[in-house]
Amino acid sequence: INAQPLVSVIIPTLNRYIYLKDVMLDLEKQSYKNFDVIVVDQSNPFDADFYNQFKLKLNVIKQDEKLLWTARNRAVRESKADYLLFFDDDSRVGTDWIEQHVKTIDFFKADISAGVSLAVIGGKVPPSYNYFRWADQFDSGNALVNRAVLKKIGLFDLQFNKQSMGDGEFGIRAYINGVKSISNP
């Protein structure tokens, strides 16, 4: 791949500014520099001034509907990047997070770098997820996706808007369509 492709970090959020602040601070410290951040903010009340404190290339979209998969799809449509990095508004990452996802895509000639998410800070990655392998999971809170995948299989299915598992369905659809997805510990 291009040595430094543009990556859009996509974050839907809903009334979680206290957590989102740490997310943004983690993104400011990334070793990989060619990225922008698209936040689809569904909060009520919406706090536009919150975003002024961060030194990031930010595109903040206010969305009135409280619909997770609609928010992710809207950010995809707004992005100009070839790579989309799906992230959650309460996650924490190291300084090389984006860089490691890009390296995984490049090294394995993959379409998706499927990261592992842990429920608690300092939690242990399960042994079966502690090495690179063909992915059997897709977590929309930690995955880098080549835009070509979305052109091939479509966006997130909106029937999951009022429930979870939209990312699970997306991962199955990617697998069925022969998309190369690598589990990135």
List PLM regions with ranges:
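Short aromatic/hydrophobic "clamp" motif used to bind/position activated sugar donors
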Residues: L84
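Catalytic beta-strand/loop signature of glycosyltransferases that borders the donor
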Residues: S181-P185
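Glycine-rich, basic loop-to-helix element that forms the pyrophosphate-binding segment
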Residues: K62-S79
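Conserved donor NDP-sugar-binding/catalytic core segment of glycosyltransferases
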Residues: D96-P127
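Cell-envelope/extracellular polymer assembly enzymes that use nucleotide-activated donors
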Residues: P5-S8, D36, E169
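Acidic donor-binding segment of Leloir-type glycosyltransferases
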Residues: M24-K62
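Acidic donor-binding loop at a coil-to-helix junction in glycosyltransferase catalytic cores
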Residues: Q163-F170
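N-proximal low-complexity "stem/linker" segments adjacent to membrane-targeting elements
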Residues: I1-D26
